[in-house]
Amino acid sequence: MPQEWNISYGNLRFLLKPMGFKHTGLFPEQAVNWDWFSEIIGDAVRSGRSVKVLNLFAYTGGATVAAAAAGASVCHVDAAKGMVAQAKQNAALSGLAGAPIRYIVDDCQKFVEREIRRGNKYDGIIMDPPSYGRGPTGEVWKIEDSVDGLIRLSASLLSDSPLFFLINSYTTGLSPLTMKYILDRYVTDRCGGVSEAAEIALPVKSTHGLLPCGASARWYAK
């Protein structure tokens, strides 16, 4: 097996390399979400609107690259410096080295709190929080305990005419319906629009079945 290699998805290109925890640097099941919000962004941009997107727990930038390719300005936030560096590589591979992407190495919740104080707003928010983790000073992140508060805070960063909100989870203890309920509570009830949630999966060619790969809940304006 090579140490690293590139793959393509449409006009996007990504660097893959084996990492710990059986990761390769990309979650291909997220392509269904990339296509979804890229269409929303593209429609808005074609109508003459500028679109700002916040990508939290942004990892190696699959969603960042997809959103930027669709025409959005993106703020990419992840606490791991190495992941942010690989996100820059992925943007360059996709011809987006000069795209309006801000790369931030920071704790995502603390960044959101600062953005609230600064009064910044975003038209779309993407988040892919980990199931469990520890911050730089030992604070514990457990998605079942913390995701409600994070979505509540992040929802206050939505603009007056928001386009979408997406949350992904790979935690069995956080069901799609639970994520949808939280989105409805903090986003749909305030902004109107439509919410939906479902498992996401990868097709298995040998069996013609589907391999479950987590879940997504997403909201979009009508």
Predicted regions and their residues:
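Conserved SAM-binding motif I beta-strand of class I
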Residues: 73-79
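Short glycine-dipeptide loop
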Residues: 153, 158-165
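Conserved SAM-binding loop of SAM-dependent methyltransferases across substrates and taxa
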Residues: 60-72
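Mobile active-site "lid"/loop adjacent to the S-adenosyl-L-methionine
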Residues: 81-83, 105-109, 122-153
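Conserved class I S-adenosyl-L-methionine
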Residues: 49-59
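Non-catalytic substrate-recognition/targeting regions of SAM-dependent transferases
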Residues: 1-28, 35
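S-adenosyl-L-methionine
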Residues: 80-126
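C-terminal catalytic and target-recognition region of SAM-dependent MTase-like enzymes
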Residues: 162-222
